């Protein structure tokens, strides 16, 4: 994502893929313009936030007209590097890893899982969907050309040492599905997806902030 270069707030950067997905569907449906209210209802972000987010990229919308869908689409595609393919690896082809490999990410964007790794002899050498499973012990031998992101779906007990090895191999970003809070050098970005925490948060919000 080029948002670092644009110096936009991280919260805005995180919403960009959400906007992009919706704008892409509008474009596919032949829609030519969209208002911030329509956008707001679709992506469930209030329209003032949308206008502020968009203002970081310059005046993209016109009062009473809304936003030009084609313009937004090319703008987001470029900002999110959608014209460039991003190669990703996945480590740990168990229940969760298999489900992620079977989900076709590239249908919606240009992110492709090219390699999967595991230690289980029964899985090494097989394919899940289109993705070949390699021997994790051979990571360095196989090498990671043009790969900067890893999805981590190993058991918790293996998480930290797997992350250490990924960092040594040159990975810059880890999408961590394990419950472990990873320690990594400052230049490595970790995004943590903890379903238990998300569920707990939802329970809390339902109780304390009823809609
Ligand atoms: N299954 C879920 O719904 C779920 C949901 C949220 C989070 N998680 C977390 O995701 C992780 C994986 O969960 P799961 O249910 O898929 O587990 P799993 O036991 O089914 O799969 C783990 C896989 O990792 C492999 N593995 C073990 N050590 C490895 C290593 N050092 N290097 C590479 N591969 C290795 C195993 O052979 C296995 O294939 C866990 O940390 C779990 O807490 C799972």
Curated annotation (Swiss-Prot):
GO terms for molecular function: DNA binding; DNA-binding transcription factor activity. SUPFAM superfamilies: NAD(P)-binding Rossmann-fold domains (SSF51735), Winged helix' DNA-binding domain (SSF46785). The keyword Protein biosynthesis does not apply. Pfam families: CoA_binding, Put_DNA-bind_N. Keywords: Cytoplasm, DNA-binding, NAD, Repressor, Transcription, Transcription regulation. Residues 18-57 bind DNA. GO terms for biological process: negative regulation of DNA-templated transcription; response to redox state. It is found in: Cytoplasm. InterPro entries: CoA-bd, NAD(P)-bd_dom_sf, Rex_DNA-bd_C_dom, Tscrpt_rep_Rex, WH-like_DNA-bd_sf, WH_DNA-bd_sf. HAMAP family: Rex. Homodimer. Modulates transcription in response to changes in cellular NADH/NAD(+) redox state. Belongs to the transcriptional regulatory Rex family. This is Redox-sensing transcriptional repressor Rex. It comes from Shouchella clausii (strain KSM-K16) (Alkalihalobacillus clausii).
């Amino acid at each position: 994502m080029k948002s670092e270069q644009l110096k936009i707030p991280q919260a805005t950067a995180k919403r960009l893929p959400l906007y992009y997905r919706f704008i892409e569907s509008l474009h596919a449906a032949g829609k030519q313009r969209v208002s911030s209210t329509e956008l707001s209802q679709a992506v469930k972000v209030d329209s003032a936030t949308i206008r502020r987010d968009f203002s970081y990229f310059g005046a993209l919308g016109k009062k009473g007209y809304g936003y030009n869908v084609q313009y937004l689409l090319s703008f987001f595609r470029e900002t999110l590097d959608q014209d460039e393919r991003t190669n990703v690896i996945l480590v740990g082809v168990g229940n969760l890893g298999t489900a992620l490999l079977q989900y076709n990410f590239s249908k919606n964007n240009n992110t492709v899982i090219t390699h999967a790794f595991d230690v289980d002899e029964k899985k090494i050498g097989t394919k899940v969907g289109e993705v070949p499973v390699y021997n994790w012990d051979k990571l360095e031998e196989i090498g990671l050309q043009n790969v900067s992101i890893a999805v981590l779906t190993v058991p918790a007990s293996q998480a930290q040492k797997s992350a250490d090895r990924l960092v040594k191999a040159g990975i810059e970003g880890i999408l961590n599905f394990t419950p472990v809070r990873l320690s990594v050098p400052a230049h490595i970005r970790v995004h943590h997806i903890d379903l238990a925490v998300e569920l707990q948060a939802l329970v809390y919000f339902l109780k304390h902030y009823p809609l």
